[in-house]
């Protein structure tokens, strides 16, 4: 016969086991939740575990800033820069300034306690130091494969902030514009890209930081430019005249970085440049210098760049 005391003891044991099971399940759920709240990001300097939907985000890369702006993602800290009109709101005082385009302010960054830091080429050497403050990813674009690199970076941002569907929608629309521009480029002859700075000129070709015109949009290069990496080839007016491009695209670096210097239009105002097919057919296009030199591969900015080239052809 089962006594009352034994029955009570058994009931207590069952309750204890049930409570233990619930606690274990809750703990497992907490672990799974914690695991789901982070993800591993492969980037230019390795792989980094980053939070999903980080609350406080700092970026030195204006292309990433432009992409996050296009996706309606809040950004809390940016470098002091000469922002183009499309990103001028980030120059406001309430947005934390985390240094310059090339030099991080480590004290300000540490004080802000960011959950994620995004960098690219200009501050790539500071990756290790920044990684000590917060998870840091390097979204530098690979100029040798700029389009796919840009897409991968954009998709990475989409995954971090759970905006994958919106990213694919915007990339799809952009790819349609690229195809339309390539059709125009097929019959547009050739082109040369020149940047002016301090009265000097540098040419950029396929595979360069501005190579989207050739590599992605399909305009034939007017010359084989010998520049390496981020740096183009120093050229003269005679070079431009001898190359004789059908289209000439011009970037004024002095305007982009906010320094005084002879305007690109004045630099190119000479008889040698005027003798080119580009000048004679009014096919010299002055590019938005901040957009092309400072921002580059951002989701909205690439759309603007593609539209500019499309209209020029």
Task: State the predicted function of each range.
Residues 2-62, 165-192, 254-264, 287-290, ...:
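Bacterial Sec-exported substrate-binding components of ABC uptake systems
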Residues 56-111:
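A short, structured surface patch at a secondary-structure boundary
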Residues 113-119, 135, 240, 244-248:
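Proline-aspartate-enriched helix->loop->beta-strand connector
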Residues 129-198, 295-313:
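Extracytoplasmic substrate-binding proteins
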């Amino acid at each position: 016969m089962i006594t009352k005391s034994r029955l009570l003891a058994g009931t207590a044991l069952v309750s204890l086991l049930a409570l233990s099971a619930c606690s274990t399940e809750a703990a497992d759920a907490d672990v799974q939740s914690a695991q789901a709240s982070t993800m591993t990001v492969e980037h230019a300097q390795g792989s980094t575990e980053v939070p999903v939907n980080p609350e406080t985000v700092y970026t030195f890369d204006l292309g990433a800033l432009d992409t996050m702006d296009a996706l309606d993602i809040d950004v809390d800290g940016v470098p002091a820069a000469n922002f183009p009109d499309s990103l001028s709101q980030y120059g406001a005082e309430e947005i934390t300034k985390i240094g310059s385009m090339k030099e991080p302010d480590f004290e300000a960054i540490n004080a802000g306690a960011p959950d994620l830091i995004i960098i690219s080429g200009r501050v790539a050497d500071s990756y290790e130091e920044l990684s000590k403050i917060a998870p840091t990813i390097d979204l530098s674009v690979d100029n040798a494969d700029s389009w796919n690199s840009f897409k991968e970076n954009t998709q990475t941002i989409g995954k971090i902030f759970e905006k994958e569907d919106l990213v694919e929608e915007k990339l799809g629309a952009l790819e349609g514009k690229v195809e339309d521009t390539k059709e125009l480029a097929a019959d547009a002859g050739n082109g040369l890209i020149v940047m002016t700075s301090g009265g000097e000129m540098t040419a950029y070709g396929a595979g360069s930081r501005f190579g989207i015109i050739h590599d992605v949009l399909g305009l034939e290069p007017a010359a084989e430019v010998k520049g390496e990496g981020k740096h183009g080839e120093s050229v003269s007016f005679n070079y431009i005249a001898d190359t004789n491009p059908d289209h000439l695209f011009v970037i004024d670096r002095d305007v982009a970085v906010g320094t005084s210097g002879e305007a690109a239009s004045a630099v190119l105002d000479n008889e040698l440049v005027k003798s080119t097919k580009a000048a004679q057919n009014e096919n010299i296009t002055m590019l938005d210098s901040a957009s092309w030199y400072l921002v580059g591969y951002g989701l909205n900015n690439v759309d603007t760049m593609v539209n500019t080239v499309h209209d020029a052809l």
